[in-house]
């Protein structure tokens, strides 16, 4: 996601730092034909989310499910491809519609 939930101020600040660094670095290296982008996953089935109450959290997600690592990997692969060679400084949310 783009920010943490209530009680996660430190997590939100870290995310904001990554977003700012992504945009600044993208401008710094663009003339060298280097792209810099970030991916902001929402709730994804991983070890990090395995202990969460998925039933409760799914009700918050407009697509009513957790994402998969493969869905995130597909975006990363696209951003690393020639098809994304004119995309830089962007943060792509992979979140099922839940903007947190």
For every predicted segment, state its role:
Residues 9, 17:
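NAD(P)H cofactor-binding loop motif with strongest signal on the N-terminal glycine-rich segment
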Residues 66-99:
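C-terminal substrate-recognition "lid" of short-chain dehydrogenase/reductases
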Residues 53-71:
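Catalytic Tyr-x(3-8)-Lys segment
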Residues 14, 22:
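Active-site helix of classical SDR
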């Amino acid at each position: 996601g783009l920010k943490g939930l209530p009680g996660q101020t430190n997590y939100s600040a870290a995310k904001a730092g990554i977003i700012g660094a992504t945009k600044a670095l993208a401008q710094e290296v663009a003339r060298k034909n280097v792209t810099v982008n970030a991916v902001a996953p929402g709730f994804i089935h991983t070890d990090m989310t395995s202990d969460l109450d998925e039933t409760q959290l799914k009700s918050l997600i407009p697509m009513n499910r957790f994402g998969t690592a493969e869905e995130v990997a597909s975006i990363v692969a696209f951003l690393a491809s020639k098809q994304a060679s004119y995309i830089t400084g962007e943060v792509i949310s992979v979140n099922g519609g839940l903007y947190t």
